[in-house]
Amino acid sequence: MTGNEIRESYLKFFEKKGHKILPSASLIPLNDPSILWTAAGMVPFKPFFTGAAKPEYTRVTTCQKCIRTPDIESVGKTARHHTFFEMLGNFSFGDYFKESAIPWAWEFVTEHLRLPADKLWISIFLDDDEAFEIWNKTVGVPAGRIVRMGKDTNFWEIGVGPCGPCSEIYVDLGAERGCGSPECKVGCDCDRFLEIWNLVFIQFFKDEEGNYTPLTSKGIDTGFGLERVASVMQGVPTNFDTDLFREIMDFTAGLFGLKYGVDGRVDVALKVIADHCRAITFAVADGALPSNEGRGYVIRRLLRRAVRFGRLLGIEDPFLHEVSGAVVRQMGRVYPELVTQREHVFRVIRREEERFGETLAQGTEMLNRLIAEARQAGSAVVSGEDAFRLYDTYGFPLELTQEMAGEQGLTVDTDGFGRAMEEQRQRARSARQETDYISGRDAMFKKMREEVGETVFVGYDALEATGRVLRIVQGGKRLESAQAGEEVEFILDVTPFYAESGGQVSDRGKVTAADLEVEIHEVTKPVENLFVHRGKVVAGILKEHDTVTARVDPARRAATCRNHSATHLLHKALKEVLGGHVNQAGSLVEPERLRFDFTHYAAATPEELQKVEELVNRMVLSALPVEAFETSLAEARKMGAAALFGEKYGERVRVVKMGDFSLELCGGTHLRNTAEVGLFKLLGESSVGAGLRRIEAVTGEGALSYVKAKEEQLAEIARLVKAAPHEAVRRVEGLLQTVRDLEAENEALQARLARYQVQDLMDRLREVKGVKVLAGQAAAPDMDSLRGMVDLLRDRVGSGVIVLGSAGENRVNLVAAVTKDLVEKGLHAGKLVKELAPVVGGGGGGRPEMAQAGGKDPSRLKEALEKTYKAVESQLK
């Protein structure tokens, strides 16, 4: 079976078992700062397992795109390690449990994949008798083929939250693939027993004290690795030999005029390139961009490693963007986002390859210098520390350093490299804090929601609502009441306050009753449909169960709505002006301003920004109606609604439509008509990372204030240049031209003065041990002028040492130059100024040919210059 056939067969099998087939979530996790990547099939469903959100379906099956990067250096060298892989899975949220999950897994592998039952082994958690009974009695697996294993391998848990035992299906690949030990069995580190399916039975909740409580609503989370299963079904020794990789590897080999399977060294490089290019292509299509931190650093590191292995195969020009095309051709049918984002992906990869080419040249220069230094020291070894520095700073793999050093007859201290690598890993482990699947605060509010129920949000249609106080919290502790002066968090059963989410800040306002007044500073939503109001009691007493009136600050809400609706117009305008590749990468919507991050390869030109601003304002003047409605995710996609990369949407979504111009999935608050924006004004555009740009803007009263401030600045400039405002630009241009003319005249005078001074200074030329030495004081306004005079003197002298000094108020400049022939005899300008600078209370240094220094004591400049001759004499000894 091909990889595509296995994928399709799995999904259809579970669809017939009542599961909803859902598309893969983005590789960029939604609202989960604890992880960089979606690394398992269950990650998109974590809120359902933790109880933080309610699922649309209780049975789901997916083929999830995944990235894992802890073992990057192993990729290409082992049979199974990958950075990108596909994880098939079937999930139950409070529906079926072991009694169905186990028999279905067995049915699929034996009847649909037709794997021989006598080649299959089962592992279970040590104490999971229930799973044993189902495997043995219901399914019919002999007891001798069911292996009980410990908590370290067969119990799934991550910090506080849901957890449970797991059971795995292994395929026996034959004794010839094993370690030869008579003790070889399931769980052995050799390649004989290959795990293809992991079934996790989520049946406990682990609290902060480490206690395990049975869950009333149990869950199933399974992982069925497509690449591994394909290797078994296709009878090949490694995942790389499956059809999932071979097309990409053969294409890459063709670029180099090579063949896979002939040379082991070539094969490793082809595997690395294919694996890493799959990861890069999918990640960039999902919105990741190369950078120096976070997931962007992972992308950059993978790309550089792939390019370096290309260099080992002899290719110097950018090529990875072409390999990316092979990835799109092979997988675009299953993952249509690859096709729609193809041009964006190619441009990002090509630009990053070119940038790395420049970095690689710098690294090569450094390595050549290290090799030269090792030879001078009489060593034939490049130290492990230096090799690691090349790896860490310039992205040189150890293999490339070894190859280049080997060409020069040197070796590399690989043990030292390994120690340096491990030290960095230890530092990273120390710096990294383990993040629980669900924080203590979120767990508290999840439990609270179970006790008091959810909050009904009415803020789309009303700015005032009557509600009941369900719970009051302070510092994580429940309060029955809060007095005036206290800051607390509390939950209402009904609220008009928008909770901070989707880049939009929360509403502010007041909660009141007869004698009560609470100022609301912030509203959050730690778990789905639970609105937590944080505020200060300024009068009266806030009590549980009291009925109160919640009022949103209308002016603040209106200003926020203006900026949010303008953000949608801006997003669409950027796509119209810059191209369809533009996608939202983040935003901040607050009453005072808006900030919008988007994907683009270069700074927008002033002309492009002007077009964007004009288009947005044209849509404002068009008075487009703004509508918000709910529909299914599938229907919204059919309509062409824009969605945020990395966002995980439920089956029902809210769509915001602005005439026929803009259509986006959005849960924020908006205007009724674009005319209410009033005026849209761009403040600026800047870079926030490679391929990532940022625009800041204001609307309404904020835009009006900005324009008025600019008018006042123009009026002040006009006053200063003594012109009418409409003539100010012409007047300033005239003044600037006058300044340029005067500067040119001044430069000419300075050059003439320098030539006169050079003639006078030549009279100070002396000989020291047969070497011409000139040291003198010059009238030079700055260091650049002084260097220019030194260059003139060096040309006049031909062979010699020149030292010039200039003095200003509490300032001394020194410049020294040594001609090349004398550098070869041991004279060094840098050492010379280091000796002279302390005389004038300063310091400096530089290259053997040219150096400079500064000081603070002009009164001793003559003394320093006179010392030049003895210093040169000393260097000539």
Swiss-Prot record:
One Gene Ontology term from the biological process aspect of the record: alanyl-tRNA aminoacylation
GO cellular component: cytosol
Record-linked PROSITE patterns: AA_TRNA_LIGASE_II_ALA
Swiss-Prot/TrEMBL keywords: Aminoacyl-tRNA synthetase, ATP-binding, Cytoplasm, Ligase, Metal-binding, Nucleotide-binding, Protein biosynthesis, RNA-binding, tRNA-binding, Zinc
Subcellular location: Cytoplasm
UniProt cross-references to InterPro entries, sorted A to Z: aa-tRNA-synth_II/BPL/LPL (IPR045864), Ala-tRNA-lgiase_IIc (IPR002318), Ala-tRNA-ligase_IIc_anticod-bd (IPR018162), Ala-tRNA-synth_IIc_core (IPR018165), Ala-tRNA-synth_IIc_N (IPR018164), Ala-tRNA_ligase (IPR050058), Ala_tRNA_ligase_euk/bac (IPR023033), DHHA1_dom (IPR003156)
Taxonomy, superkingdom: Bacteria
SMART domains documented for this protein: tRNA_SAD
UniProt: Zn(2+) binding residues: 564, 568, 666, 670
Protein EC: 6.1.1.7
Domain-related comment: Consists of three domains; the N-terminal catalytic domain, the editing domain and the C-terminal C-Ala domain. The editing domain removes incorrectly charged amino acids, while the C-Ala domain, along with tRNA(Ala), serves as a bridge to cooperatively bring together the editing and aminoacylation centers thus stimulating deacylation of misacylated tRNAs.
Family: Belongs to the class-II aminoacyl-tRNA synthetase family.
Role: Catalyzes the attachment of alanine to tRNA(Ala) in a two-step reaction: alanine is first activated by ATP to form Ala-AMP and then transferred to the acceptor end of tRNA(Ala). Also edits incorrectly charged Ser-tRNA(Ala) and Gly-tRNA(Ala) via its editing domain.
Name of the protein: Alanine--tRNA ligase
Organism: Pelotomaculum thermopropionicum (strain DSM 13744 / JCM 10971 / SI)
